[in-house]
């Protein structure tokens, strides 16, 4: 999960 909105929300 590095190109997903969920991952982006974590960072």
Swiss-Prot record:
Its EC number is 1.3.3.11. It comes from the Bacteria. Keywords: Oxidoreductase, PQQ biosynthesis. GO terms for biological process: pyrroloquinoline quinone biosynthetic process. Pathway: Cofactor biosynthesis; pyrroloquinoline quinone biosynthesis. It catalyses: 6-(2-amino-2-carboxyethyl)-7,8-dioxo-1,2,3,4,7,8-hexahydroquinoline-2,4-dicarboxylate + 3 O2 = pyrroloquinoline quinone + 2 H2O2 + 2 H2O + H(+). One of its GO terms (molecular function) is pyrroloquinoline-quinone synthase activity. The keyword Oxidoreductase applies. Belongs to the PqqC family. Ring cyclization and eight-electron oxidation of 3a-(2-amino-2-carboxyethyl)-4,5-dioxo-4,5,6,7,8,9-hexahydroquinoline-7,9-dicarboxylic-acid to PQQ. This is Pyrroloquinoline-quinone synthase. It comes from Pseudomonas protegens (strain DSM 19095 / LMG 27888 / CFBP 6595 / CHA0). The gene is pqqC.
């Amino acid at each position: 999960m590095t190109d997903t909105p969920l991952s982006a929300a974590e960072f």
